């Protein structure tokens, strides 16, 4: 991998890496330890790994119980229709912070890091971890006015200014470093594309982002604008050891050894769309990203479409 990732930005003194850790379901896909280890072996700089808490990243149970609208429910309920709608109306998470849930999700996160061998990897490599949820909820965040001024010197204002209050002070202090969106290659399900751009949705601090999902495209692109204003952005999408693949049913495809990468995340994702059989013109957030960060090369996408069966012959 070192010979492939020969970009001066990847030789920076400090590199921030955002893995894809939305959950632990291998059939959905998440960044496993082996792939992250391979990336770390290819980099010489000081490494900072960042991610938010996720209600789906923990032991396989329903999570803690709580009362919502007079009924006893648990975390799993929040992923369903009524729970999701309830969460849209309670975006402050005060019920979660005050009811013992915060301690539980901390324990779940430690379980995840231990269970999937990230703790050992980070200790071995001297990796610093910055949890976005923890930092923002503890009040250790950058001045939103500073973030607003920096972002709006380069890009149009965010649709919702709450986004400016979601940057950990520790990450802000590292501005100017390289930031890698280290995403998982997945065959889309119902045209849901999750590559290097969508990986930034995990930089929002909410452990489940139902409120932000109401304005998904603008929330995602505004988050990317924030980090593109602070860092040198680099996208890597990997299908090294396995990828989840949808074709009538779920499948796990092993040992493809695929790596897509580049500074232009819009182009990386658009070409990947071509490879997996999705028209990027039909993905609304890619269209918005193109308007914001610049156009991708349509010819490259057509080349990817033509090569798709060679890359994925199943």
PLM feature spans:
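Extended, low-polarity segments enriched in aliphatic/aromatic residues
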Residues: 1-314
């Amino acid at each position: 991998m070192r010979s492939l990732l020969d970009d001066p930005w990847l030789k920076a003194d400090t590199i921030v890496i955002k893995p894809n850790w939305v959950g632990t379901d291998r059939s959905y896909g998440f960044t496993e330890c082996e792939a992250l280890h391979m990336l770390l072996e290819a980099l010489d700089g000081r490494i900072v790994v960042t991610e938010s808490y996720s209600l789906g990243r923990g032991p396989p149970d329903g999570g803690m119980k709580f009362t919502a609208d007079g009924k006893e429910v648990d975390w799993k309920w929040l992923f369903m229709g009524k729970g999701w709608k309830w969460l849209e109306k309670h975006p402050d998470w005060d019920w979660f912070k005050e009811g013992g849930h915060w301690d539980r999700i901390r324990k779940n996160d430690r379980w995840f890091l231990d269970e999937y061998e990230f703790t050992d990897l980070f200790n071995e490599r001297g990796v610093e971890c910055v949890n976005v949820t923890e930092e923002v909820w503890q009040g250790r965040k950058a001045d939103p006015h500073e973030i607003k001024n920096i972002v709006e010197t380069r890009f149009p204002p965010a649709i919702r200014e709450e986004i400016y209050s979601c940057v950990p002070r520790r990450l802000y202090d590292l501005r100017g470093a390289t930031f890698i969106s280290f995403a998982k290659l997945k065959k889309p399900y119902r045209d849901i594309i999750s590559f290097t751009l969508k990986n930034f949705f995990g930089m929002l601090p909410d452990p489940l982002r139902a409120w932000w999902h109401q304005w998904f495209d603008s929330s995602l692109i505004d988050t990317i604008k924030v980090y593109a204003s602070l860092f040198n952005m680099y996208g890597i999408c990997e299908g090294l050891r396995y990828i989840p693949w949808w074709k009538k049913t779920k499948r796990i495809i092993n040992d493809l050894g695929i790596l897509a990468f580049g500074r232009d995340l819009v182009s990386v994702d658009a070409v990947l769309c071509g490879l997996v059989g999705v028209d990027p013109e039909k993905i609304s957030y890619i269209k918005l990203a193109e308007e914001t960060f610049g156009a991708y090369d349509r010819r490259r996408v057509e080349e990817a479409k033509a090569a798709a069966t060679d890359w994925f012959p199943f």
